[in-house]
Amino acid sequence: MSETGSVKFTCDRVVVELSRFAGFDELNEFRRKLLRLGTIGIDTNGVGFGNLSVRNGATSHFYITGSGTGKLPELMPADCARVVAYDFARNWLQCEGVTVASSESLTHAAVYESDPSTCAVIHCHDIKLWTALLHKVPTTPEKVEYGTPEMAYAVRGLFDNTDVLKKKIFVMAGHAGGVVAFGRDLRSAFAQLTKERMNEEGREELRIKNTPRWDRGG
C-alpha cells in the first residue's frame, strides 16, 4: 500500500540501505507533530496517508517518506527513499532505498523543480482545512488525480499562474483532504500549515459566535 493508495508511476528502485541523512531528525520531528494532529497516519481501512520530503538545495535529489509508512509512529532511514531521477512525461521515477518512494513523489518533485529555494514539502490530509481553503488558495483542478503526471504538471502550472510561491500552500481539488505546504525547511512548511489551521479555527469560532442560539441545534 502507498500512503494514499497505489503507486501510479513506474519505479526503478536501487535497493540499498540508506544511512542517516541531513534533515532526517527534522523529518521525524515534524512527522510526529503531524501524526498527533491526525493529518498523516492510516485510515479505517488500514491505508496510510500523508508524506514529507526534504532535499539538499544544492541537488535535485530529495528524500521522501516511503510508501506504506503511515502506520509507523517513528521512522528509520530505511523507511525513506531517495529520489534521484524522474520524468513526468514517462510517469517514471528512480529511487534508492529498501522501500518504494511515496506515491506522491512526482508532486514533491514538481514543487522542488518549480522553486529552487524550497527544501521541504508536506502533503497532509485535513478535510476541514481543505474545505476552507478550496479555491481560496491555489488549487489544482478537480479532474486531476493525485500521484499522476497530470498532478505534477498541474502543480507546475500553479507556480506559473498563481501566487502559490507567496502563499506556500495549495490544495488538490480532486483529492479530498489533500493539502500541500512547502518552504525552505520543514519548520517553515509546518508553520505555514499551522497558520492556516489557526485561521480556520478562528473563522469557525466567529461563525459559531454569529449564529443565533436558536439556529445552533442541540
Please identify what each model-predicted range represents.
Residues 1-218:
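Glycine-rich flexible loops
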